């Protein structure tokens, strides 16, 4: 780990990229405290302070890094964009004609354009829903409501696209994946508050928090982090033999299939897909008994919420991994390059790879699901503060560890392109292990 931090400060270009990334994330944090025009911050603070840990409002606030409770310009984060991306990818996967349209640079540009159009639609819908939610907060809206709706929708939609631009700037000039780091930073800022609440609960006799349980949970937290790292690196290697030109000899290689090829994306997608309808329903909770009933069933970290989250994680693990690693495309590429899999006929290669992928994806999705239910277990068994249970496991921990590992891989790739992987192999041994 020491070598990693040294590289961030001793390699000039990498240092500049790292500092630029921190600067962009700092701008995101500043924007999280800038409220939408027409909102009374004092009324908001009083309202959110009165909300229980189990409320939908606190759930939104947790994953937005505090932007939701401030009704800030970034209160939707990049959720609308992720929702739009899911819809577009589902359509492309379902319709072969759309899949053909995506081929080539021109096709990919069209897909990006349609995704941005859908992002606007999703942001407008969510912006309208949050406007209705603000109307239900006593004294929160200080201007005529019809005017506030227009201002709020325009502001949060613009805020979402500003964050997308931030993410693109990090991709081009910074370190790591920009959109993932924005989500990551929003969760990390809640870590300090969660730990503070934990130690505060230990000192409060009415909370009845056993210090032994605290040590146990922290130990479990460390163990889970280690398991996530190992799961992230785990892979099955399939031997491949390539025939040499003008020779009877073969060259042996292998095809690595990760336990979870899509990384942290299924968890992010599942979280966003749950949040979207919850945000819309919360806007109508004041006037609709049906919306209130659905929200009560989908209480964060409740049974139905956890069950739905697990189903979505499993579904997105299979869906997104099959998009990234198509058995048909892989088998075609192996055959084109004169490769064979020992013991497998050429025309059965696709079926074999599909079976192997299904087995690895099943194990990977079950692991992610087990991690996802940890907050539910911690909250209901040990009665820990709600934000503490979210940090100790589940989607938040998977996102934090997954994005951190992805960033390390980006750093490793950059160092290799700059010639550090050979000349300074000893100094970057930690990165090589990752």
Curated annotation (Swiss-Prot):
A GO cellular-component term linked to this record: plasma membrane
UniProt-listed InterPro entries: SecY, SecY/SEC61-alpha, SecY_CS, SecY_dom_sf
Gene3D superfamilies tied to this protein: SecY subunit domain
Entry keywords, A to Z: Cell inner membrane, Cell membrane, Membrane, Protein transport, Translocation, Transmembrane, Transmembrane helix, Transport
Bilayer topology: Multi-pass membrane protein
Subcellular location per the Swiss-Prot or TrEMBL entry: Cell inner membrane
Main location as per UniProt: membrane
Domain of life of the source: Bacteria
GO biological process per UniProt: intracellular protein transmembrane transport; protein targeting; protein transport by the Sec complex
Presence of the UniProt keyword ATP-binding in the record: no
HAMAP family: SecY
Complex and partners: Component of the Sec protein translocase complex. Heterotrimer consisting of SecY, SecE and SecG subunits. The heterotrimers can form oligomers, although 1 heterotrimer is thought to be able to translocate proteins. Interacts with the ribosome. Interacts with SecDF, and other proteins may be involved. Interacts with SecA.
Role summary: The central subunit of the protein translocation channel SecYEG. Consists of two halves formed by TMs 1-5 and 6-10. These two domains form a lateral gate at the front which open onto the bilayer between TMs 2 and 7, and are clamped together by SecE at the back. The channel is closed by both a pore ring composed of hydrophobic SecY resides and a short helix (helix 2A) on the extracellular side of the membrane which forms a plug. The plug probably moves laterally to allow the channel to open. The ring and the pore may move independently.
Family per record: Belongs to the SecY/SEC61-alpha family.
PANTHER family assigned: SECY/SEC61-ALPHA FAMILY MEMBER (PTHR10906)
Protein name as catalogued: Protein translocase subunit SecY
Organism annotation: Borreliella burgdorferi (strain ATCC 35210 / DSM 4680 / CIP 102532 / B31)
Gene: secY
